[in-house]
């Protein structure tokens, strides 16, 4: 690869690191082209999976301010650049690696923080952002319903108590 081509490749990779909220490094040794195509589809629309040259990618990551990945650039390396929900792509990688042991998750970075392979697998065990937001909204809605019931119960209980007192006084007044 000519020097200007290398500089362009480094610039493009650095842009991908900057525009991604997560990147996962994998070793793909032994995977066929068809398997790589299946892997790319399993990552979702918001992820791009690229086979990369270690030296160029290491330089690009450092240019993008990510210097925690240096130890992971050995052997055949591919990077999943994730711009959307990292949980969805992490699930895709984990599930694909279960079915295809030739794919090895090396580690990655999420919002500038280095992640080990185990941390990426734990990330994959989380529910997606949308599901977590829906659960949170459901919890708030349930609490609001309980509060509304409580606020409705207080005045009606007060009215029933006042009515019982009035009836008791009327009964006591009529008995005398």
UniProtKB/Swiss-Prot annotation:
GO biological process terms, semicolon-separated: translation
Sorted UniProt keywords: Ribonucleoprotein, Ribosomal protein, RNA-binding, rRNA-binding
Top-level taxon: Bacteria
Family: Belongs to the universal ribosomal protein uL10 family.
InterPro entries the UniProt entry points to: Ribosomal_uL10, Ribosomal_uL10-like_sf, Ribosomal_uL10_bac, Ribosomal_uL10_bac_type, Ribosomal_uL10_CS_bac
Phylogenetic lineage: Bacteria, Bacillati, Actinomycetota, Actinomycetes, Kitasatosporales
Keyword Cell cycle: no
Keyword RNA-binding annotated: yes
Cited PANTHER family: 39S RIBOSOMAL PROTEIN L10, MITOCHONDRIAL
GO CC annotations, alphabetized: large ribosomal subunit
Classification via Pfam families: Ribosomal_L10 (PF00466)
Protein name: Large ribosomal subunit protein uL10
Annotated function: Forms part of the ribosomal stalk, playing a central role in the interaction of the ribosome with GTP-bound translation factors.
Source organism (scientific name): Streptomyces avermitilis (strain ATCC 31267 / DSM 46492 / JCM 5070 / NBRC 14893 / NCIMB 12804 / NRRL 8165 / MA-4680)
Subunit structure: Part of the ribosomal stalk of the 50S ribosomal subunit. The N-terminus interacts with L11 and the large rRNA to form the base of the stalk. The C-terminus forms an elongated spine to which L12 dimers bind in a sequential fashion forming a multimeric L10(L12)X complex.
Molecular function per GO: large ribosomal subunit rRNA binding; structural constituent of ribosome
């Amino acid at each position: 690869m000519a020097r200007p081509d290398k500089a362009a490749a480094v610039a493009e990779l650095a842009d991908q690191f900057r525009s991604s909220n997560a990147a996962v490094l994998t070793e793909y040794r032994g995977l066929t082209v068809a398997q790589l195509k299946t892997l790319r589809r399993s990552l979702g629309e918001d992820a791009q999976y690229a086979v990369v040259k270690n030296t160029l990618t290491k330089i690009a990551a450092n240019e993008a301010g990510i210097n925690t990945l240096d130890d992971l650039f050995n052997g055949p390396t591919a990077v999943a650049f994730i711009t959307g929900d990292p949980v969805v792509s992490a699930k895709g990688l984990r599930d694909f690696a279960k079915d295809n042991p030739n794919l090895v998750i090396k580690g990655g970075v999420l919002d500038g923080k280095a992640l080990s392979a185990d941390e990426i697998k734990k990330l994959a065990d989380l529910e997606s952002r949308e599901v977590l937001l829906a659960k949170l909204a459901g919890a708030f809605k349930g609490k609001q319903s309980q509060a509304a019931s409580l606020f409705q119960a207080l005045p009606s209980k007060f009215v029933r108590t006042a009515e019982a007192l009035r009836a008791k006084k009327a009964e006591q007044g009529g008995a005398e």
